[in-house]
Swiss-Prot record:
Glycosylation sites: 111, 252, 949-950, 994, 1032, 1099, 1147, 1152
Domain (PLAC) ranges: 1060-1098
Entry keywords, A to Z: Collagen degradation, Disulfide bond, Extracellular matrix, Glycoprotein, Hydrolase, Metal-binding, Metalloprotease, Protease, Repeat, Secreted, Signal, Zinc, Zymogen
Official protein name in the record: A disintegrin and metalloproteinase with thrombospondin motifs 2
Localization per Swiss-Prot or TrEMBL: Secreted, Extracellular space, Extracellular matrix
Biased composition (Pro residues): 214-223
Domain TSP type-1 as annotated: residue spans: 561-617, 855-913, 915-975, 976-1030
Motif (Cell attachment site): 692-694
Pro-piece positions: 29-260
Record's function text: Cleaves the propeptides of type I and II collagen prior to fibril assembly. Does not act on type III collagen. Cleaves lysyl oxidase LOX at a site downstream of its propeptide cleavage site to produce a short LOX form with reduced collagen-binding activity.
Originating gene: Adamts2
Any single Gene Ontology cellular-component annotation: extracellular matrix
Gene3D superfamilies (alphabetical): 2.60.120.830, 3.40.1620.60, Collagenase (Catalytic Domain) (3.40.390.10), Thrombospondin type-1 (TSP1) repeat (2.20.100.10)
Cofactor note: Binds 1 zinc ion per subunit.
Amino acid sequence: MDPPAGAARRLLCPALLLLLLPPPPLLLLPPPPASVRLVAATEPPGGPPGQGAERILAVPVRTDAQGRLVSHVVSLETAGAGVRARRAALDQTSGLPGGAAQDPGGRLFYNLTVFGRDLHLRLRPNARLVAPGATVEWQGETGDTRVEPLLGSCLYVGDVADLPKASSVALSNCDGLAGLIRMEEEEFFIEPLEKGQTDQEAEQGRVHVVYRRPPTPKPPPVSEPQALDTGVSQGNLDSLSRALGVLEERINSSRRRVRRHATDDDYNIEVLLGVDDSVVQFHGKEHVQKYLLTLMNIVNEIYHDESLGAHINVVLVRIILLSHAKSMSLIEIGNPSQSLENVCRWAYLQQKPDTDHDEYHDHAIFLTRQDFGPSGMQGYAPVTGMCHPVRSCTLNHEDGFSSAFVVAHETGHVLGMEHDGQGNRCGDEVRLGSIMAPLVQAAFHRFHWSRCSQQELSRYLHSYDCLRDDPFAHDWPALPQLPGLHYSMNEQCRFDFGLGYMMCTAFRTFDPCKQLWCSHPDNPYFCKTKKGPPLDGTMCAPGKHCFKGHCIWLTPDILKRDGNWGAWTPFGSCSRTCGTGVKFRTRQCDNPHPANGGRTCSGLAYDFQLCNPQDCPNSLADFREEQCQQWDLYFEHGDVQHHWLPHEHRDAKERCHLYCESKETGEVVSMKRMVHDGTRCSYKDAFSLCVRGDCRKVGCDGVIGSRKQEDKCGVCGGDNTHCKVVKGTFTRSPRKQDYIKMFEIPAGARHLLIQEADTTSHHLSVKNLETGKFILNEENHLDPNSRSFIAMGVEWEYRNEDERETLQTIGPLHGTITVLVIPEGDTRISLTYKYMIHEDSLNVDDNNVLEDDAVRHEWALKKWSPCSKPCGGGSQFTKYGCRRRLDSKMVHRAFCSALAKPKAIRRACNPQECSQPVWVTGEWEPCTQSCGRTGMQVRSVRCIQPLHNNTTRSVHTKHCNDHRPESRRACNRELCPGRWRAGSWSQCSVTCGNGTQERPVLCRTADDNFGVCREERPETARICRLAPCPRNGSDPSKKSYVVQWLSRPDPDSPIQKISSKDQCQGDKSMFCRMEVLSRYCSIPSYNKLCCKSCNPPRNLSNTEDGGVEPPPGKHNDIDVFMPTLPGPTVATQVQPSPGPPLEAPLNVSSTNATEDHPETNAVDVPYKIHGVDEEVPSPNLIPRRPSLYVKTRNQRIQELINAVQRKEKPGKF
């Protein structure tokens, strides 16, 4: 079926035919019938998360249940050894640094700050996503296959603290954090900025990208809904089952699973996930498995949404990653139906014959990045195909994590769900983000299953018996510690080289455990090896097994042993006596030590705490500066001693290594060592500290990992309400060539800015008032170059551009400074300054104190938001507005833009129960037309819910349970009054003798539409008389015909003659007007049929225009288009026979009434059409095109006339 034109050509979900061609001979599968139809595509759900979304960088940290920092390591792999660490992650309960053991239930906790919001994530393992015994299979180009256990131990679900019922989280921590965080009004994507950097997490944490998706745009309205979704009928399923034959019987019988059934409320979709090479190449072989697990974790979370109304788990039992060649053979570019057919057949061939096999799947999901359909097509699937051996499959275009909605949508089709708004009444839920919308508009913060999806699922779900078994209820055998215990050397040879290969036995001089040598029985002396030993545990001799390349007796002490942490040591001494230091404790992985390939301990081997946070007596001391000064006498650079000053490296990763700057040369030199533990990481952050070469985030509250910060004037967690802005301008005139004192800046000043008002040749100078040392431009040591430098424990930025100087620092100043000017000439000097300071530290003239917008205004409670529900228990939040402190007047919120907005307070509201909404209808509006065929009446139909305060409100129509009253109806559907319109008379039907003429007569309205005419209809046919025809002979091959009616009495009803009591209503047939038939008036049935012609009231020659009056009664234009003979009173039979001559050719008139005619008492008998030979000369007949109106209601007569006309040559009849 071609897609509809216009906007619908975007392929919302076109119904396309799946034409299953015969398979290749090796498949041994009969093709399903061509009538099987599949549901097609869905539009993309907005592209990858980054498109159209806000994004920030964030560094999540791992915490305990109370939100206290445990480690910067967030990846499960980081502390372990690859796959082995992942496999054992859930068993490890004491591997967390900081003494915070992992929750016994395997729960994890993370802190994350996104867009100004602090989130505390509480996660639990998603233990029901990957089935026990599940595998991942890599298929190579040469046909070789590598199978590995599928491990899902790094998949988690959970919620956000403080929003347990209004949030959901689905993350993986295989390699950083990746997945979704969904809250009431927002949703976030998170993924590592760069993959494969888990080894760097322990140093300074792992940088992640967090996307915030904007609201999904409202779709354009569709003028007419189109039912584009058509599923497979039951007949098609039956025919497909018959086509599968014996194979089908075997599969159907095998559905009686013997595993323990799940509870009646639980359904498990065991999934085979097929992935083609385009997906593998895009994500990379080393990352694709983690990505697939994260994607399916999100799909599983979508099916856990309570709006679905059912408990459905999506369980992975097998992943197959296809080779490039196989991927190209399955997907046909631009042909979605053939591509889906190929995928479904491929999935069928992957099915395990034993239903008890742990890889037996109920449903196949295939992911590709190839364009299998038109642009924009994202998915393709059958409807109601679940549990079917061939049709339980979907084809999906993979395009990032948002493809989870495409997978959920297409699997919904297989479960029996239709598109919302197409064939159901849920089109109004499309814009709300319903999963089954024709264009997928669901977003991670606003998705739901519509009420129609819930109803359609409940209609079919109980019939899907394959979803009843529980894959987690097996008593699965424990995996052997040594894999070779289950595979002999012969089996390993077959794996390596193919069927028939066995261990080489031609030579017995080598140790079989050194290298695996294989040969084929056809050539036993030709041995091959892949230069690798057999698997550990492979039997090599009676009672002996291969281990580490040796054939030995296996004893418990040589088997693999995993390591475990020992006890913590006591905390050591503090690294500093004041100014906040750190102290450590350690532990060893010796309880027991890992051995024989066992996994090492996960987590950090040390833990630390802050100590001695009190300020040092010397407030001007700079711990980093002291460390540089210690090397003045010991560290020579360029064979010269230097005075070393502190330097902050531009690279954040190097800031916990000691770099110093030469006071003499300005060179920056690495001291080849780390700074002491407890040194501030940066002069821009007064609290974060270096610990063993790593910068550890510390909040202003002294808590490790805390995000709490100071406001602009140093109040921890403050809102700038106690900040004052001080500014001023000082102007001096040089009177001598000596320092000119301008002003002083007090200790505690922050965000200091000093600059020249005009361009001058003077030099700015700054001196520490307490020590008397210059920190910028001494008189005998001027440096006019722009630069950054560290002095008095803070970083300064000095700029000299076009002889206009500027000096600024974030601060805070630990002591008072004096600002001076070194004059050059006698030009007046003007300096301006501006800084912020806490109001309690203010000791300046009030004239210099200013209050900016951030100080003069504050956020204030404005009102409570409307309750989210009018009944049944809703919630409302505080709404804040910007208020001016001076007069408490509410102003525009822009004045408070620099202030942190308080968090909204939530409270419950409207707890009373809701009443059932009912349908309320309005009055019918006047009809749109007074007559015709388009008249309509409309009225309003609303779903109204009575409220507790004797008011009502309009609610969504889905809340009203009863049948919705009609809102439109037809009215005044009758023909409009018209007038008869007659056309011109046609040419006489003969050239001599008596013939007929016709003309069209139509009843039309003023606007030329069909109408109803109440006046008598003008005649449409009349007799024309021309000169008598000559009686000479004619061509015997030419024949004319006359119709002869033969009737016999009806034995059940006596013949009734026409009497005066039976008033003649006019002729009932067009043949009555032909004079040659007048001889049949003696027959009662014919006399009654042609009562007017057989009993003329006056001479026809005296009739006006020589015509015959039409029968009385009203005739409308509908008669013209539906001409017919009177009722079925005559049967016909063609039989040529001689008869009386015809004076006019047989012609069907168009004046046929539509009124019902009373039946006669005559029983139909065949009548005959007799040939009239050599009586009418051929030039007498005028050939003409049969009228469009030549029809009869008597089907037998019409068929007879048509048959005669076909037999004769054109122009003869």
